[in-house]
Amino acid sequence: NVASGNDSSRKKKYLDELKKISKGTVTVQQEHFYLKPGNQARLEFNLVAEGLRKIALLWQLIKNGTLEKGAVLFWDEPEANINPKFIPEIVKILLMLQEDGVQVFISTHDYFLAKYFDVLKNNKDAVHYYSFYKAAEETGKEQICVEQASSFKLLEHNTIMETFRKLYEDEIGVSFK
């Protein structure tokens, strides 16, 4: 359980990881959220960069016990407005939540976020990749299809990988298919 007790070691581990990214802690006073970076004065959430607000909100959801075994987290493009150097840390935290019984759904168009799940997951992690794409029916109309794989690289309809490959080809002037 992620949040068992006020000072559970598991919760502390999450909060410590998130504190490395946000460089502060989250406080709530009179239903207003604040980020307190180190020894600086607290900042209202609306004055904090969007990426830090996301991290601070995740911090608060863990701190208050919302994200515990059986909970579901939906996160649309967690990489948006986040410094790319923190992507591996975010993936580690999401994998930890999954290990603790939180069901995590993310959507992304980011190669690095998707690939870090492949790199950092272990055999016991329940990570699945889904690709939604349009395909022509026999009638000539397009339909939405879905493909599922246990690894990012195994998706056949993978526009993220196709775009990354195209960039690489453009950069070195060679075609890889």
Q: What do the predicted segments below correspond to?
A:
Residues 1-70, 135-177:
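Phosphate-coordinating catalytic segments in nucleotide- and nucleic-acid-processing enzymes
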Residues 69-72, 101-105:
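Loop/turn-to-beta-strand initiation segments
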Residues 76-78:
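Walker B catalytic acidic pair
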Residues 89-91:
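Conserved hydrophobic alpha-helix in the ABC-type ATPase nucleotide-binding domain
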Residues 94, 98-99:
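Conserved ATPase "switch" residues in P-loop NTPase domains
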Residues 107-109:
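H-loop/switch region of ABC-family ATPase nucleotide-binding domains
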